[in-house]
Amino acid sequence: RESSAWVSQLGALRAANDKVPAAEARPAHEQWWKDFWTRSWIFPEGTEEAKAVGRAYALQRWIQAGAARGAYPIKFNGSLFTVDGFMDKKGVYEEFGPDWRRWGGCYWFQNTREPYWAMLYSGDYDQMEPLWKMYREAVPMLKERTKTYFKHDGIYCSETMHPWGLNKLGDFGNNNPDFYPTNGFVRRYWDSGNELSQMMLDFYEHTGNEEFAKNTMIPIADGVVTFYEQHYPKTEPGKPRFAPAMSLETYHTAEDPFPVIVGLRTVLTRLLALPDSLS
């Protein structure tokens, strides 16, 4: 039933688009791309290697622009540009279709972040909204998860996350009685919340968008720092001890990991420097 509803919605969207005559759609399409290419550019010159870098940069922006304006963020494993092909697996050729993606359908933040940092510094701010939207709409679920699992406030962002906020099931584990994923590579890997907050703070500094700051950036960043403040014990007043913790995916057991400390210090310093009008 859900798949038939999706097909019906897709058909309605196509029908709405078909109502726009090609004679009108084509000029609007061309104007969009003209505006896109003239709002920022880099054309390195001097050597063939420099020119090759420039072509790669332009291609990367084109790929991102073609995929970044949908309802969801760009998928790191193929984006819109998945293709038919073959995979050599232990000497066996295995067919797969254009909708097949290695690593599945979740968002892995370490990979998802890459095109969005590039958009930020290219000035392609409008293309970042699907990423903000996904996390903004996941906040109620993330708050409820923290309350249910750990009996305190705040939010933590999973490294492998469905659009609605929860872990990839294969990482969390079927019939897992614990509140931590069974996959050791992401069991306590929550650094993405700090980096996401940092990206949002940069976005606000670039754009000055106060509505974004009030409705997206501050609720998410506040939820992240609240989680760290309430989840970990204090060794003395005002001094938390981040353990047990992780350092990226690399070190599965860590105490006071460097990325967590630097992330929190940076984000908290920047949050405290925001104007009072945003509070």
Residue ranges of predicted features:
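The feature captures the catalytic groove of carbohydrate-active enzymes
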Residues: 4, 76-105, 157-215, 226-279
